Amino acid sequence: MAIHKPLENLYIVDLDQPLEGFYNFLNSWVYKKDGLTIAVDPGPRSTIPVLVEALKQLKVERLDYILLTHIHIDHAGGAGLLVKHFPEARVICHPKGVKHMVDPSKLWEGSRQFLGKVADVYGEIAAVPEKNIGYQNPVEAGDVVINIFETPGHAPSHLCYQIGNLLFLGEVAGINYPLDRALYLRIATPPPFIYEIYRASLEKAASLDVSHVCFGHYGYRKDVRNVFDTALNQLDNWLATVEKHIRAGSDPFDELVYADLLKNDRGLSLYYSLPTDVQSREKIFSVNSIKGMKDYLQNK
């Protein structure tokens, strides 16, 4: 288990999974200040024991809030189990996602269909008691104010949370891999993807006055402008590249699009600096993002 303290009051808990390349990929955030403790994206069921042990090491006896950026299994699947350990916790979730966290049967079924064995590794989504979950904006807890912003580009239930100068991004700006000062960024546009909504969500997040952005995948960055400029450029570049290959009738489509992106996309420029198993992981998720864009272009 690894716990990092990048800033005062802020901790990263690594949630590595027993899958190829699934390290430096998932994390949960813990924010502690003046007796208040907040967890952002507790992760899947499989690593709730890791998070609980981390909270124990951080001397957390009371968990006040669990903030869900969205209800995908890798971010929210373990929330119900975490509530069993901390029954006083209030789970904050987009209104569209509340019913799916109270009764996650359809969400679990969809996760298994979409992710296959990866969902099985993550573990079945744990139900959150209805009395523990809801939505309010802002959340005021003593001197701490949590402002919430709807950013539905990656998922309809996606939210970003601002606490002071920190912005918890979820996946609104994609996926970061820690490479010292250099930026590796990969977009997250799974089906169903709608370009206009995704771009508006990115622009909304980019407009906020913050000093650090905290990713659901993975870690944090303080070059905030660079992150959003790269993400916006990447969004438009990927869409244009996918459209070019649709018009050309490229086959095999995914392989040719991805090869093109590795040559022309600045967010992916450090792809070959990644460990080989992480490259394999990133290719799988990139192909899924390509599919989201292809479906959008063919159906609009």
Report the location of each language-model feature.
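Conserved beta-strand hairpin/beta-sheet module of binuclear metal-dependent hydrolase folds
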Residues: 2-57, 161-171
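Metallo-beta-lactamase
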Residues: 5, 101-150, 156-225
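Active-site neighborhood of phospho(di)ester-bond hydrolases with catalytic His/Asp-centered motifs
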Residues: 40-43, 64-71, 92-94, 151-153, ...
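Active-site metal-binding motif and surrounding structural segment of the metallo-beta-lactamase
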Residues: 48-94
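Histidine/acidic-residue-rich catalytic or RNA/ligand-binding cores of hydrolases
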Residues: 224-233
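Charged, amphipathic alpha-helical linkers/stalks
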Residues: 232-250
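C-terminal regulatory/interaction regions
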Residues: 244-300
